[in-house]
Curated annotation (Swiss-Prot):
Binding-site residues for ATP, renumbered to this chain: 154-209
UniProt-recorded name of the protein: D-alanine--D-alanine ligase
Lineage: Bacteria, Pseudomonadati, Pseudomonadota, Gammaproteobacteria, Alteromonadales
Matches recorded under SUPFAM superfamilies: Glutathione synthetase ATP-binding domain-like, PreATP-grasp domain
GO molecular function terms noted in the UniProt entry: ATP binding; D-alanine-D-alanine ligase activity; metal ion binding
Length: 336
């Protein structure tokens, strides 16, 4: 049997750099059980350098090999890479574009699918095109007085809004607006995080999540899990990743009827297939009190920390993450 050299790439230098390192540790623990892979941990720094765990700066070349600063070390040929980078430049599709150019196989969604899902405005256009209901919204391209007036009008109609940087992940640059007078400041603040902003109607609803992934030639959608925030508050970046988070998670959402479960899974599969995702994603929904289903967002590289939902839902569905990972990699490298 062939053994393959695999780069586990993490970090990225963005707002989710440290979370990426935690997720990479989960990948590393799984890869340690798979004898067919030699794994090299690389951290992509904010300066754009590749750094080994020992702190050595290396180069990942267009020839798909690692070159070390110590020229006495032979180049290390790379067969495959796992870009475990949340946010920029991983989930944005940027680094996948480079891998495509140098023909380096990688784990996760492709560059276009990643970009389409990461930008909240583009994603909503796709959801609507696929016939998947989503939250009412408007988008802004500048923090002008006219734009702020449009948000105030939406606030008057909807009662409350979320103001979100259109191209950030994990609730970064997202602000709930409960008072009209807060809107100008929050709009300007959101524009500090991205060149476009999306404003959504606040939905009072349960937050359900579905793990969708490729497994042995089939696309699997789990039964929805649920996040219950403390005091029904906004699921912030801190609530998502702090080990002291007060949010409660259910690997399978309680008290959801089978018809609704089936509809949610159908929408999740429709989004995964229609947007040409691959390998894995976490697809998040709102479920309102009157049983209305709204697709909230798609995470093309979901967190894999000790409190993350994706690996828990996969295991609850009866699949082992290491086995899932191995078959995904070998399917690409060996055409299985």
């Amino acid at each position: 049997m062939n053994k393959y050299n695999l780069v586990l790439l993490c970090g990225g230098g963005g707002s989710e750099h440290d979370i990426s390192l935690l997720s990479a540790k989960y990948f590393e623990s799984c890869l340690a059980t798979l004898p067919r892979f030699n794994t090299l941990w690389l951290e992509l720094t904010a300066e754009g350098q590749f750094r080994t765990r020992e702190g050595e700066i290396v180069e990942l070349t267009n020839r798909r090999e690692i070159r070390f600063a110590d020229e006495a070390k032979a180049p290390w040929s790379v067969d495959y890479v796992i870009p475990c980078i949340h946010g920029y430049p991983g989930e944005t599709g940027d680094i996948q574009s480079w891998f495509n150019l140098i023909r380096l196989p990688y784990f996760g969604c492709g560059s276009e699918a990643s970009s389409n899902c990461f930008n909240k405005i583009t994603a909503k256009m796709w959801f609507s095109a696929l016939g998947i209901p989503n939250t009412p919204y408007l988008y802004l391209d500048e923090p002008s007085n006219d734009a702020i007036a449009r948000v105030e009008a939406a606030f008057d109609e909807w009662g409350s809004v979320f103001i979100k940087a259109a191209s950030q992940g994990s609730s970064v640059g997202c602000f709930p607006a409960h008072r009209r007078e807060d809107i100008p400041g929050l709009v300007r603040k959101a524009f500090e995080y991205a060149p476009f902003v999306v404003v959504e109607k606040t939905i009072k609803a349960r937050e359900l999540e579905v793990a969708v992934y490729d497994y042995q030639g089939e696309i699997v959608a789990t039964r929805p899990g649920e996040i219950v925030c403390a005091a029904n508050t906004f699921y912030s970046f801190e609530e998502k990743y702090d080990t002291k988070s007060q949010a409660v998670t259910h690997v399978e959402a309680p008290d959801v009827d089978e018809e609704t479960v089936a509809a949610i899974r159908d929408y999740a599969l429709r989004a995964f297939k229609g947007m040409k995702l691959r390998h894995l994603s976490r697809i998040d929904f709102f479920l309102t009190e009157d049983n209305q289903i709204l697709l909230n967002e798609i995470n093309t590289f979901p967190g894999l920390t000790q409190i993350s939902m994706f690996p828990k839902m996969l295991a609850h569905h009866g699949h082992d993450f290491a086995t899932f990972l191995e078959q995904a990699i070998l399917a690409e490298l060996e055409g299985r």
